[in-house]
Amino acid sequence: MDDHKRPLYLPFAGPAILEAPLINKGSAFTDEERVFFNLEGLLPHVIETIEEQASRAYDQYTNFTNDLDRHIYLRNIQDTNETLYYRLVQNHITEMMPIIYTPTVGMACERFSKNYRRNRGLFISYPHKDRIEDILNNSTRQKVKIIVVTDGERILGLGDQGIGGMGIPIGKLSLYTSCGGISPAYTLPITLDVGTDNPHLLEDPMYMGWRNQRIGGEEYKEFVEAFMQAVNRRWPDALIQFEDFAQKNAMPLLERYKDQYCCFNDDIQGTAAVTVGSLLAACKAAKSQLCEQRIAFLGAGSAGCGIAEAIVAQMVSEGIDEAQARSQVFMVDRWGLLQDNMPNLLNFQEKLAQKTQAVKDWTIENGNISLLDVMNNAKPTVLIGVSGAPGLFSEEIIKAMHQHCPRPIVFPLSNPTSRVEATPKDVLHWTNGQALVATGSPFEPVALNGETFEIAQCNNSYIFPGIGLGVLSAGAKRVSDEMLMASSRALAECSPLALNGEGPLLPPLEEIHQVSKHIAFAVAKVAVEQGHALPCTDELLAQSIENNFWTAEYRRYKRTSF
């Protein structure tokens, strides 16, 4: 019997049920349930279906005049009736995705303390480092299977938001459920409150976090280590997603824990997976391979380098050697093109630095090799922006790229919208509609020369929900690079442009459930093949994915004793 058809036995009654968002039905409680659970008189007379409730909620939603108020309204529904929240979001996924996550979630993080209403998730503060296990046991969620954790230091492109960063784990887990069918009862957002270096927060009397400079060094490492060990003891089968950690911590934490626990970093690996999937779709539509492309990056931090390494791995899988693949990738940061003779390269940048000998004959304007110099000399066919700095894909740069590449692939991926390297409208105008554009944040379609261009949102929400569903369904103990590569290829297989030669690069969000299931199967299959999960047939994996896919429907309740 499907979970939503199986009755749920509850040992409590009265107002306590109405205050529990996972089980509250509001006006949808039946006459029988109202009697059995002492709810008579606590609700209006009319008994509604979930669709009737969702219709009223949407009517209220449309009365708000700005996106932040809409976000707050939806969060209020989530904190009172989660099933209704997810039905509403699923009914209007394209419209509401930018409200519950990027770009609106950025504003919500900045105003988190000012707008705080109800508790959700766990805040683990450094002064409580000796009580982490107790805090985990205080969680209202007992069967946690997916955790998203942040320390709030690098929230989107907004920097240090302290505990305000909690908006990101909450939003990400909302997408695990609305896109990937993960039951909200299995999800837990966590913020590691290690202080903040944001002076505005430290001076803000409303700031609700630990009012202290951020800890670092060994103190920080020991705190995170204590957290990881405590989580593993409490929920040994949970998938842990690292989210919005600063560059100095993101890659070291991933390298330290990826072979110890079932974990991944969405900023590094999820962004890489969705970008590679989008590039594979673009290449397939052009009847070419990724290994034939020359790729320039603006932004050489952990996210950019993570994407580049995933691209190199895919190129190698297509038949070229690693050295050749790396020679076709050009990483540009604030100091110019990364070269192997540069001092102070970070560990994860070293393998992606160009050989100085290979660029010694380039014609350059100044001492450092700029992005424009890369355009004029390397003649890239793909341009990816992960700089977090707006407007850096200038008209001059895009036109220089278009001069040597008739159909340039341009991905300005920085979030939120205010940080994007170039708008799709500008890129399409500068290339007379010839560029293939995907962005990190949502943009409206662009009208040009009598055509309407749908802008693909190269958003991690296409990838991480499917990864989570696949890991959960297979019972995987690790998230391997091969599992992530499988997710990229599975996403590319869903591309309307690649499949039909027309349409958007990525499937519409209305199809996200099918996409997530397709990705989940690919991920789960590789997990089994690599021994990260118990042996299982394809048929049983597919059935497990269906069984684990939660839908926003009310269950029947029956009374039981404690």
Curated annotation (Swiss-Prot):
The active site is at residues 101, 172. A divalent metal cation binds at residues 243-244, 267. It is an enzyme of class 1 (oxidoreductase). GO terms for cellular component: cytosol. It holds the Pfam family malic. It catalyses: (S)-malate + NAD(+) = pyruvate + CO2 + NADH; oxaloacetate + H(+) = pyruvate + CO2. The keyword Metal-binding applies. SUPFAM superfamilies: Aminoacid dehydrogenase-like, N-terminal domain (SSF53223), NAD(P)-binding Rossmann-fold domains (SSF51735). Divalent metal cations. Prefers magnesium or manganese. Its cofactor is Mg(2+); Mn(2+). The keyword Oxidoreductase applies. The record marks 267 as: Important for activity. NAD(+) binds at residues 154, 267, 415. InterPro entries: Aminoacid_DH-like_N_sf (IPR046346), Malic_enzyme_CS (IPR015884), Malic_N_dom (IPR012301), Malic_N_dom_sf (IPR037062), Malic_NAD-bd (IPR012302), Malic_OxRdtase (IPR001891), NAD(P)-bd_dom_sf (IPR036291), NAD_malic_enz_proteobac (IPR023667). Keywords: Metal-binding, NAD, Oxidoreductase. Its EC number is 1.1.1.38. One of its GO terms (molecular function) is metal ion binding. GO terms for biological process: malate metabolic process. HAMAP family: NAD_malic_enz (MF_01619). Homotetramer. Belongs to the malic enzymes family. This is NAD-dependent malic enzyme. It comes from Shewanella woodyi (strain ATCC 51908 / MS32).
